[in-house]
Amino acid sequence: MIRYNLTEFFKLSAALNYQLSVSNDLSWNILRIILGDVKLSQEQHDIMLDALSYLNHAYKDQHRRMGPLSVLHPLRATAILSRTVEKVNMLDLLTELLHDKHEDINVSNYPEDKYGKDYYQQLEKEFDHFLYKNDPNDNWYLMERLDLLSRKGEESYFTYIGRLMNRARQTPELVRVKLADRLDNTLDLHSEFYDPIEHTDFFAELFHILYIKNYQPPEPEVQHPIRHPLYGAYRLYQLFKNAVLMSIIRRRQSMSHDAAAQPLLEQLIRASMEEAQRVIIHIFNYHLKDVELQRRLLLDTMDYCQKGGMLEITRPGNRSRLDGLFMNYFEYGSAEEHKQKLDMLYKDKPLMIQTALAFVTIFKNFLLDPNYYIEGIHETGFHPREGL
């Protein structure tokens, strides 16, 4: 089983992107990359190729916020699923490949001035042709899963994940599909090939800051990266989404319905913890270089965590700047408010450090304690205890 750190993620992305660049169609070579060791019949291979052709036409020249082709996301997520979960079947693979169909492939995304007349209708005909060749029973379950995996209108992320986990008792494979989706999204937050995690012993660096009185950190090996759309506060928000997903999974005991997905959960936990570490290393290297300030932030956050601050949702208060952290910066009522809150967090580098340290603690708890989850996270939102 491959451990998907950032390096392995880039290798997978490069292999898929190379195949996309040498052919206008999603080829048999791409299917082999996706399947890994999964064995399919010739008929199933042909159906998978039809699904890939549909995705190729549906995503066409569309790009993700970071810049890569949009079609890479479902391809990578499916490859991660097939290489991480011990036993996957045809329905699992098709569900992962098409999990964003209802959100990404709708008539509003294909304006006539860009795609020509009736392009969306042609896509729907191609999808119907794919369904016609597939097993009718699988089609029923596939369409049900795709509907369940789609957020409905203004549905909050809490409600969406809660609804998915409610259904996991009947359809346990939803857990593995969502975990593979989130693992790919978590790893897809960077374009720079240099990964500070591979060049810095994170916990040794914290030890030096805390215990060596006149410690002088080495200069960073590379210049400050150019800011890109997925800036630090946005990446912290993605970690918040992972913490919500993991907490609801743990609280609902959803992994008991799909124990084979446990390696995916562990990989998502590790990827999330490492992303929080990257945020800290970056800010210490380029923005807050005063070791005394770094030490104060570490000690203050450590004290807050040791007193149980990261065990449950808290309201804003005077105990610490971390009181009410999730409610203050990650809860929002509109897209504009969401952006404003993340911009506020981004400008407050000391709080970003403490937030990232809190996430390192949260994900370490998830890794070490199989019963850990953040109290107060429910499908209806945040519910802190009275007095907190």
PLM region descriptions:
Residues 2-388:
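Active-site helical microenvironments for divalent-metal-assisted chemistry
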